[in-house]
Amino acid sequence: MAVLQVLHIPDERLRKVAEPVKEVNAEIQRIVDDMFDTMYAEEGIGLAATQVDIHQRIIVIDVSENREEQLVLINPEMLEKDGETGIEEGCLSIPEQRALVPRAEKVKIRALDRDGKPFELEADGLLAICIQHEMDHLVGKLFIDYLSPLKQQRIRQKVEKLDRLRSRA
């Protein structure tokens, strides 16, 4: 298992549309394990494969306080959305920045688990928001895309400055 490098904006690889996973095999399971290691190391609650430069439809999520409720979504499909909500979202690809993003309050999805078995899931609250956020990554969309151009520019400038400071350290 390994911690992978998380891409940061303005990296254009974050805009790539992920391809469906053709077969859930040992290689995909290794990617899932590495993604969980990376997500936990970065103190995130969700990670899409796109964020670690793997352009396949794979998401890992754990919104639990004790980090013991791993959720794997391979080839996720949105079946239903209901209601309206929003929280200040953050993103491992947009470090130390947060913004209020409109989301559906409840979602119903279909996906494959880490063993390739299909399942459906209904979610609300933080889990529903996280699922929507990570599914956006699979189509090259970031939470800042929901913001005004001015807010997008300010966030990009802050992240670029932060990355410059980190690269000097």
From Swiss-Prot:
InterPro entries: Peptide_deformylase, Peptide_deformylase_sf. Removes the formyl group from the N-terminal Met of newly synthesized proteins. Requires at least a dipeptide for an efficient rate of reaction. N-terminal L-methionine is a prerequisite for activity but the enzyme has broad specificity at other positions. The lineage of its organism: Bacteria, Pseudomonadati, Pseudomonadota, Gammaproteobacteria, Enterobacterales. Its cofactor is Fe(2+). Pfam families: Pep_deformylase. It catalyses: N-terminal N-formyl-L-methionyl-[peptide] + H2O = N-terminal L-methionyl-[peptide] + formate. Fe cation binds at residues 91, 133, 137. This is Peptide deformylase.
